[in-house]
């Protein structure tokens, strides 16, 4: 049984966030917890025991089965975390995108899942994390370099980044397939935002959605690699 999560935010002056999970087979939804403030980007841990989300620049974890008070994931000086964070396949580490105090630009860091001092991975910014390879060796992210946003990869321990896309316009949301052979992403290169797929080395970039009325964003691949979920936004 596959379950997805999402945050529903009613249109009120005072924001209320509703964290829900959904059985994608039956469509049944259930509320995990309501918050009288904004939370974003809940991620399942690989073992399914926790949902990790960001709020107010910090990261928290919450049990979907017995939600009590959320537990803070201590990240030391990294207190400007945005909604781009990913958990490693072994569940031992979490990678975050955090706005640095020096220039406000988002950079990528890693830290133990239980909390700790972050390790800077991308000295250059802005960099927005989206994917972690199944073998734990590479991170995939969207970054702006020289005026264009493209997909990059970098060793998870730090090192030289590699640019994978060169099309004009925004290439964003890269995520590895469970087999590690592909990276899925979204690109506006054909006019509307569409879902694309390429090999992990950047070759064979192939358009996967062809919707003429809606923009398609942020593909997420099911653990068995047989399905993807993504956002649809109607064009204006």
Q: Which role fits each region the language model picked out?
A:
Residues 1-236:
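Sequence signature of WD/YWTD-type beta-propeller architectures
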